[in-house]
Amino acid sequence: MKTIFHIDVNSAFLSWSAVKRLKEDPNALDLRTVPSVVGGDRKTRHGIVTAKSIPAKKFGIKTADTVASAIQRCPDLIVIPADFTTYREYSRAFIKILKSYTDKVEQVSIDEAYLDATNLGDPIELAERIKAEIRDTLGFTVNVGISSNKLLAKMASDFSKPDKIHTLFIEEVPDKMWPLPIGELHGCGKKTSEKLQRFGISTIGDAASTSLEVLQSILGEKGGEYIFNGSRGNSSDKVHTEHEEAKSYSNETTLPHDITPDNYEAEMAQVLKWLSEKVSARLKKDGVFAKTIDVQVKTNTFHRRSIQTKLPDATNEADLIFKTATGLIEKLLLGENGVFRTETGIRLVGVGATDLDNGEYKQLDLFSYQKEQEEAKLEKKAQKEKEDKLNAMADKIKGKFGEGAISRGFSR
């Protein structure tokens, strides 16, 4: 049996902004200790809450609330804008620490990752070491969920916060997981939860005691199968490391809340930028280029949609990948038959790069061009030398026989 960790940064965006402020000014107010949120502008009251402090949570403020409604609940609320440059910096530092323990790390979003801790010693002691190193070195806290598969590890890390370690092994599922509301099952969104509750399925335990056929009749084939397996604690234990992928490079992230038509403009670009930079970094690390870029989404009803395009020239540059991905997702979500015409929210976004080459054609083209240029120079030089000799000979003939002795030839 494997040992899988799910490690999740507590209120990541808010924590990282707080740490940055304290690093710049040790006497600054720690945003984590007062009612505060990340998202939008307090003056205009525009934007969506993307992260909140524990004191803010006590006012009933939730992720994905509008800033206006959050301020109504807490008039003294501190609102700060998102700072994705800082988030990327701390995310890289967070993952670097995890990879110092094992290379079996799968980053699933900017602030969370799975780690295969099989055969790495006592799981609780290891989790304590990792948690303490992140707190002492980087200044923020994490939750660690421990189980034998990814779903249960994720569920465990979502138990009480912050700075906690929780286990949820299969034998603990009836006591720890089944009493929870069905909406707290990882991957069960608001609309799915509402559908299930209309059929009397209110807890995860209720779903676990419902047949696959009934669940599929309510949610469809894929949605029903997911809830059937998830409610029983069944999930993959495979941690996908970056170097295992050979024929394509892709990164995807499960969002902290759904992206909808209302918050699309405010939030999608930052998600795509982060994913594009991840894909670009991996391509460059392996020295390869991609000619096809694709974007994938998963809706809050478990449907996956994707779109791709072929580039004129292969690339591994983040800016071009981001620009291409932005155009693709606009078409996928907002186009004539876009996802948002039938779906209300996106819970997962991915960016991929395929149709790879290692740059040999680029190098060959460069070398061929250089060779052609050198050959052209030599040919031009030889032609000039030949003309100089002919001109010198002509001058001699003219000097001996007169100017009319030689004239230019022409073709008819």
Residue spans of the language-model regions?
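Short, internal active-site loops enriched in acidic
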Residues: 119-121, 149-153, 233, 298-302, ...
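Gly/Gly-Pro- and Ser/Thr-rich, intrinsically disordered tail segments characteristic of DNA damage-repair
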Residues: 1-229, 281, 374-412
